[in-house]
């Protein structure tokens, strides 16, 4: 029995919603904007731009100017120090660290619980739903998923927040049930020392039936190369 066929059926209802994106994209985007504006209306940022009186995209466009990260940075620094209800109403404790492509400085991007659930995790589920539609005979769930991410650490300047790669934040906060169908363990996945981490992941993964890969392609290539070296094989298939 192909267990993937059974599990993939749970994604069918979501596919119907995804299909609406192609026919009602504009309406959906306006709905999302209105919802976000309403939710953030009582934050310091929302009050500054009088979000409570915004009724349309045109209102938002005229009221809220395009701004750079440097202009928003003071709010981010206050959030990292423990202040809340500045840019978003729910508690912000996680900050994703960018690679610093602008001004050669890393940026700290606030990550709310809503962003995790409604964007990142839902996006992953949507990608899986579309994959199963295109590949109905997939054996995705017949083995485990190899997930390769970065690491995170406490904010050295404040005990109110944690900083890390977005991938590490996703691994740390994912539904615990995922731990039963993925490798490596969370402890290994979040190691900060890269060489030690690659060795640990390779050693824990080699004996496992891996049926999917998730992670930054360049990082994954390094890991796969190491696994091939350790097993003296030419292919992972």
For the regions a protein language model found, what residue spans apply to each?
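Active-site phosphate/ATP/adenylate-binding loop shared across adenylate-forming ligases
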Residues: 1-237
């Amino acid at each position: 029995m192909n267990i993937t066929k059974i599990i993939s059926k749970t994604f069918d209802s979501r596919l119907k919603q995804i299909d609406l994106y192609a026919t009602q994209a504009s309406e959906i985007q306006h709905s999302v904007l209105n919802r976000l504006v309403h939710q953030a209306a009582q934050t310091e940022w929302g009050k500054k731009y009088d979000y409570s009186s915004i009724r349309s995209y045109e209102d938002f466009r005229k009221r809220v100017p395009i701004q750079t990260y440097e202009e928003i940075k003071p709010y981010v620094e206050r959030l990292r120090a423990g202040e809340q209800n500045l840019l978003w109403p729910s508690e912000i404790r996680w900050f994703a660290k960018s690679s610093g492509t602008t001004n050669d400085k890393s940026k700290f991007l606030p990550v709310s619980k809503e962003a995790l659930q409604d964007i990142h995790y839902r996006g992953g589920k949507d990608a899986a739903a579309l994959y199963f539609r295109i590949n109905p005979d997939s054996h995705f769930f017949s083995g485990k998923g190899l997930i390769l991410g970065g690491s995170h650490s406490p904010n050295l300047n404040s005990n109110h927040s944690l900083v890390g790669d977005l991938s590490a934040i996703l691994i740390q906060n994912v539904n615990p049930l995922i731990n039963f169908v993925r490798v490596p363990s969370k402890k290994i996945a979040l190691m900060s020392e890269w060489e030690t981490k690659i060795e640990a992941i390779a050693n824990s993964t080699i004996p496992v039936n891996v049926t999917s890969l998730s992670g930054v392609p360049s990082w994954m290539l390094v890991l796969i190369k190491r696994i091939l070296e350790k097993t003296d094989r030419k292919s992972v298939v």
